[in-house]
């Protein structure tokens, strides 16, 4: 009886945890690190039924090499924390519009104390939507950053999930990253000719994910991605850049788990 009562009380609440190890780290369309990184994404909240799902999120990134710390050890890189609201609109039996809105803060702490940019916080608003259907799922993300990182970023693409052997799936996807002129400079760097970047698409990524549904609450996955900077001027700027992770083409991958309770 107590177990049934506890299950009834806890059922509206949820926790999602996704730990990953990646061979490199691409953040908002920019190759930030070409060495292994560990990422943990945690979400928790309350399912309010017709009013959506309210919660909090935390995204931690840590280096698995000593490159990102002045003390030459594995380094905590940055964390993101914010409030979230998710809402689904049922358009028909097989079509659902899913929305995810967040107000978050990104905090850089604990490495390279000689650089002010290594110890800072900025905030942002973000909306993500996807149209879930039996065919091809289109999706996009729009993020506006403030307080020292004033730029607009977007991501848009499509994906298709294929299920086989009951508990396995294969999901190919393709998407572009881009944004305002400030975002373009953040991703590519300064132009060799001294001109200002225009807003637009800065990169395209091809992704292939293979997953295994271990049980109702746990799935495991591996993925591979091909990252490509687009545009002749942008690729030339990458070639001329002294940034240690300046690669106009990059292949990487990772492994991870998805847990939901």
Tell where the protein language model's regions lie, with residue ranges:
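Short glycine/proline- and aromatic-enriched beta-strand/turn motifs that initiate or cap beta-hairpins
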Residues: 9-70, 85, 252, 258-260
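Cleavable N-terminal export/targeting peptides
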Residues: 1-16, 245
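Residues on the lipid-exposed face of transmembrane beta-strands in outer-membrane beta-barrel proteins
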Residues: 19-23, 40-46, 83-87, 101, ...
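Structural signature of outer-membrane beta-barrel domains
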Residues: 22-26, 61-65, 104-108, 143-147, ...
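Detector for outer-membrane/organellar transmembrane beta-barrel domains
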Residues: 118-204, 209
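Repeated loop/turn-to-beta-strand initiation elements of outer-membrane beta-barrel proteins
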Residues: 15, 49-56, 92-99, 133-140, ...
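Predominantly the C-terminal beta-signal and adjacent terminal strand-loop region
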Residues: 206-261
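Outer-membrane pore/translocation modules
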Residues: 18, 58-157, 236-251
């Amino acid at each position: 009886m107590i177990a049934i009562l506890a299950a009834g009380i806890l059922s509206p609440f949820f926790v999602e945890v996704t730990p990953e190890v990646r061979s490199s780290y691409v953040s908002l369309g920019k190759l930030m690190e070409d060495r292994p990184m560990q990422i943990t994404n945690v979400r928790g909240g309350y399912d309010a039924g017709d009013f959506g799902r309210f919660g909090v999120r935390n995204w931690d990134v840590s280096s698995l090499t000593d490159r990102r710390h002045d003390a030459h050890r594995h380094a905590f890189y940055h964390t993101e924390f914010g409030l979230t609201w998710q809402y689904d609109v049922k358009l028909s039996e097989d079509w659902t519009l899913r929305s995810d809105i967040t107000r978050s803060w990104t905090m850089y702490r604990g490495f390279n104390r000689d650089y002010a940019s290594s110890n800072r916080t900025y905030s942002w608003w973000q909306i993500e939507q996807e149209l879930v259907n039996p065919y091809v799922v289109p999706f996009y993300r729009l993020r506006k950053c403030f307080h020292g990182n004033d730029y607009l970023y977007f991501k848009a693409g499509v994906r298709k999930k294929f299920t086989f052997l009951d508990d396995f799936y294969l999901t190919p996807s393709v998407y572009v990253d881009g944004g305002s002129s400030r975002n373009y400079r953040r991703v590519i760097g300064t132009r060799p000719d001294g001109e200002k970047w225009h807003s637009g698409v800065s990169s395209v990524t091809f992704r292939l994910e293979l997953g295994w549904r271990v049980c109702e609450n746990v799935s495991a996955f591996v993925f591979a991605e091909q990252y490509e900077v687009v545009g002749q001027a942008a690729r030339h700027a990458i070639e001329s850049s002294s940034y240690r992770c300046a690669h106009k083409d990059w292949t990487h991958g990772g492994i991870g788990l998805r847990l939901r309770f």
